Amino acid sequence: MDFLGNYDVVVVGAGHAGIEAAHAAAMLGAKTAIFTLTLDFIGNMPCNPSIGGTAKGHLVREIDALGGLMGIAADATFLQSRMLNRGKGPAVHSLRVQTDRKRYHMWMKHALELTPNLEIHQAEIVRLDVQNGHVCGVVTALGGYYSCKCVVIATGTALGGRIFVGEAHYDGGPDGTHAATALTKDLTAHGVPLRRFKTGTPARVHRRSIDFSKLDCQPGDPDELLQPFSFMTHKPMHNKVDCYIAYTNPETHKVILDLSLIHISEPTRLALI
């Protein structure tokens, strides 16, 4: 192994959780490194590019109050902002925005690059160096070694990821990335209990192929009513696009019921951290 650096904190994964963990540690003065499989997926939102909503919107504001990045990033990159549950009492009003996922990624990447005490590495972590019950460092797929005082695992769906498309299934992560299978095996070897959760993502539909006249338009709130997530956002905010609602029908129900008879093998119990 080649010794490549020494840090107080190493964060594995640069999604929502990893970004906030690395940023918080660095801002508190810890020499921090964040590792990601690819720099192009920092803050990537491959499934649903929205921030906030019921319960989750509360969490975004708490992160912002603690000096986090998600709220201000959402304010800077949103396409549509809408306060949910306006027909109910104010206690359940929930702010939700649809973001421009590419701009969100670029905003987050730039923010991390400007964070003092923080270094970004594009590398796959395959093994933890554990000595006498304590983590002393991490090892990359290319044999690089980084010593550290603690490690934050924030790998999300990359850890032991498996993709199911109909009856086909293969190892992989979101948006064509590969699964971090080596780290999964290493954590198992260290006695870490692992469990895999399952999610479903609908196929993307090309905008030009949609007949929007058949859908219900759902505009965002008027600009004068828009509220930011972040206490640090002071610029005027403007909605840019409408959203649309579609409904299922007996034909789509039949497709779902017919496909429900297809048996997919039991997923391996892997980790989602």
Feature-to-residue mapping (PLM):
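Beta1/beta-strand and adjacent pyrophosphate-binding region of the FAD-binding site
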Residues: 3-17
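Conserved N-terminal/central alpha/beta ligand/cofactor-binding core
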Residues: 4-6, 23-131, 142, 154-183, ...
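Conserved acidic residues
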Residues: 8, 136, 149
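Conserved phosphate-binding elements of NTP-dependent enzyme cores
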Residues: 11, 21-25, 135
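Acidic-residue sensor for enzyme active/binding pockets
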Residues: 20, 62, 266
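Residues within well-formed alpha-helices
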Residues: 20-24, 147, 270
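Core beta-strand elements of the Rossmann-like FAD/NAD(P) dinucleotide-binding domain
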Residues: 141-150
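Single conserved hydrophobic/aromatic residue that forms the stacking wall/gate
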Residues: 262-273
